[in-house]
């Protein structure tokens, strides 16, 4: 018996509305900087209730073993062998978001993307509220950089960049007048990204958009024109101080002040990797480890670097950060999970997950976001979608169906 012919499936798709609403709210919370582990639990429990009520556990033996890899990575994070249970909250969020992604496919099928629209909607609404004077400037800006309600401009830069990539990747879903409305929203999100003055997000978005546009566009002049337009807009809308930062990073990246401050941070993280190479230290331990390291080596560090930051919460590099957090064992498990998901995304023609990986691979050269809800949701929810299709296909005894063909791509 194929699972979609089973009785529980017929009731399932008549009862998904509450899960859909909770998923919309989750992305709204993400866009307004108010997402917490407790709020992540809401769609998890609602979706879990629907699946349990439908007796989906009867088919658990059909689930591909590969889909269990991210769960193993989440449990490893929760357990944190190098520093017992230090990252239990991060691990819980990874597990929850991944399972929510799977549930989105099983419960909503190809309608899950509508809930993701609430991320760019939330960003747009809060920015418009700032522009019309509902929110004061000190509330949503920091050092002439836009923050909105996301606590730091670097967080806003990453979130707005992924929101923009989502709108572009799924643009074939928008029909009629909604296509024009969402195109306007995309322009607004681009402006928000520019005003965040997050140079790492700029670079990662440029690389990701280049991949997207060259993949989708037959006219190679298009990406050149778009790049020129964005550069011109950036020059006119960025405050002079932030524009100088961007120009400095282009003209002399190795002498840039921010790059200089990253060096002692990376040095401390590498020392942490050497102290616990196999099982890691946990990301929660980094602040204390970094502080102790710079205190113990203050004279040497001050002689070699122009500036040494006293308080740092993460390693500012995802590759170094993973080894510090997980060690060799956990990093291998993490990369295995992501790599296999990427392979399956290529087979499914899921362009969004591919772009997310490209973005975080570049963004991660200078930032580490897996210690925050935004980084966890924007990586592990799309991963859950990829494995969710594998699970759905396994339950149907059919090859994976592509539910989110990117704009301009043709179904085979």
Question: Where are the regions that the model predicts?
Answer:
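Transmembrane signal-anchor hairpin modules in multi-pass inner-membrane enzymes, especially those
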Residues: 1-79, 85-86, 99, 106-112, ...
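Alpha-helical transmembrane segments of multi-pass inner-membrane proteins
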Residues: 112-142, 148-216, 227, 237, ...
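Hydrophobic core segments of transmembrane alpha-helices in multi-pass, intramembrane catalytic enzymes
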Residues: 38-49, 89-102, 128, 154-170, ...
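Membrane-interface catalytic loops of GT-C/OST-like multi-pass glycosylation enzymes that act
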Residues: 35, 85-89, 144, 148-153, ...
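A membrane-periplasm/extracellular boundary helix in multi-pass inner-membrane enzymes
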Residues: 216-254, 267-275, 283
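Long extracytoplasmic/lumenal interhelical loops at the membrane interface
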Residues: 255-267, 275, 279-326
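Hydrophobic transmembrane alpha-helices and their immediate junctions
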Residues: 54-56, 181, 214, 220-225, ...
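Loop-to-helix entry and N-terminal half of a specific, functionally important transmembrane alpha helix
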Residues: 17-24, 313, 343-366, 376, ...
């Amino acid at each position: 018996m194929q699972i979609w012919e089973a009785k529980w499936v017929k009731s399932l798709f008549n009862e998904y509305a509450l899960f859909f609403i909770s998923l919309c709210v989750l992305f709204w919370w993400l866009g307004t900087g108010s997402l917490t582990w407790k709020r992540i639990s809401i769609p998890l429990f609602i979706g879990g209730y629907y699946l349990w009520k439908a007796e989906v556990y009867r088919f658990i033996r059909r689930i591909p073993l590969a889909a269990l890899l991210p769960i193993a990575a989440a449990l490893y994070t929760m357990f944190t062998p190098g520093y017992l249970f230090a990252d239990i909250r991060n691990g819980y969020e990874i597990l929850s978001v991944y399972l929510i992604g799977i549930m989105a496919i099983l419960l909503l099928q190809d309608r899950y993307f509508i809930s993701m629209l609430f991320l760019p909607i939330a960003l747009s609404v809060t920015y418009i509220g700032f522009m019309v004077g509902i929110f004061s400037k000190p509330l949503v800006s920091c050092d002439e950089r836009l923050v909105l309600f996301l606590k730091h401009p670097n967080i806003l830069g990453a979130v707005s960049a992924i929101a923009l990539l989502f709108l572009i990747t799924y643009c074939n879903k928008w029909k009629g007048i909604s296509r024009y409305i969402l195109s306007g929203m995309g322009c607004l999100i681009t402006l928000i990204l520019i005003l965040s003055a997050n140079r790492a997000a700029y670079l990662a978005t440029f690389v990701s958009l280049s991949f997207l546009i060259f993949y989708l566009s037959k006219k190679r002049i298009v990406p050149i024109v778009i790049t020129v337009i964005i550069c011109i807009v950036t020059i006119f809308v960025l405050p002079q101080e932030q524009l100088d930062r961007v120009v400095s990073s282009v003209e002399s990246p190795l002498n840039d002040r921010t790059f200089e401050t990253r060096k002692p941070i990376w040095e401390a993280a590498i020392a942490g990797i050497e102290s616990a190479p196999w099982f890691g230290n946990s990301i929660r331990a980094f602040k204390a480890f970094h502080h102790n390291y710079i205190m113990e080596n203050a004279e040497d560090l001050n002689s070699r670097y122009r500036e040494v930051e006293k308080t740092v919460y993460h390693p500012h590099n995802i590759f170094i950060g993973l080894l510090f957090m997980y060690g060799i064992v956990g990093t291998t498990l993490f990369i295995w999970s992501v790599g296999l998901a990427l392979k399956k995304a290529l087979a499914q023609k899921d362009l969004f997950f591919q772009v997310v990986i490209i973005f975080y691979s570049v963004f991660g050269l200078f930032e580490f976001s897996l210690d925050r809800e935004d980084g966890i949701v924007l990586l592990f929810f799309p991963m859950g979608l990829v494995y969710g299709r594998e699970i759905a296909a396994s339950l149907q005894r059919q090859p994976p169906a592509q539910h989110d063909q990117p704009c301009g791509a043709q179904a085979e």
